[in-house]
């Protein structure tokens, strides 16, 4: 768990039972990444509304993965079926047109909390969501793939 937190660029918490994106946790030294990966949005807010707004930035090729985690009902169903974590990866188009790869990891748990509205303890499903910018890893993978393809093409040309 500590390793996941250290690798994360952004962490935020969501009450999946009530559809509330509660807060963003900014890690020391990751303030810039946090601003890049997390939209400027007033908190607390509806998690689903936040995701739908963010979805406008997601590329068509990767939107299916993003949509697996874009609302509380889907995540609660996964949790009720025994899943406690899941990861998806998607591409977000930045304002300057560049593409950023993002890995989103959702860690879910059930907690009993005191509800001040009804003045009683109630079970809630919470998620800690971790975002990691994986653009550099994808660029390295693409460069390695191109290098291997060039070596393969050269080897094929020599064998003719």
Where are the regions that the model predicts?
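Short beta-strand/turn micro-motifs at beta-sheet edges
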Residues: 39-41, 114-117
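Membrane-proximal linker segments that couple transmembrane helices to downstream signaling/catalytic modules
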Residues: 1-3, 151-160
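Short coil/turn segments at secondary-structure boundaries
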Residues: 26, 68-70, 142-143
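PAS-family sensory domain signal
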Residues: 1-57
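Per-ARNT-Sim (PAS) sensory domains and their PAS-associated C-terminal
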Residues: 65-113, 121-125
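Hydrophobic pocket-lining residues within nucleotide cofactor-binding pockets
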Residues: 16, 109, 134
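Sensory coupling linkers of modular signal transduction proteins
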Residues: 116-156
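PAS/GAF/H-NOX family sensory domains and closely associated sensor/linker modules
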Residues: 42-82
């Amino acid at each position: 768990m500590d390793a996941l937190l250290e690798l994360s660029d952004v962490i935020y918490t969501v009450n999946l039972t009530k559809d509330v994106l509660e807060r963003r946790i900014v890690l020391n030294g990751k303030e810039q990444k946090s601003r890049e990966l997390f939209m400027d949005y007033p908190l607390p807010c509806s998690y689903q509304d936040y995701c739908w707004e963010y979805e406008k930035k997601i590329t068509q090729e990767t939107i299916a993965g993003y949509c697996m985690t874009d609302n509380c009902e889907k995540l609660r169903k996964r949790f009720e079926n025994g899943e406690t974590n899941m990861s998806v990866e998607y591409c977000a188009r930045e304002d300057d047109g560049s593409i950023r790869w993002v890995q989103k990891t959702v860690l879910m748990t059930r907690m009993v909390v005191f509800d001040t509205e009804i003045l009683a303890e109630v079970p809630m499903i919470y998620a800690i969501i971790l975002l990691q910018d994986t653009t550099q890893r994808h660029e390295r993978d693409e460069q390695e793939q191109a290098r291997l393809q060039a070596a393969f093409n050269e080897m094929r040309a020599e064998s003719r």
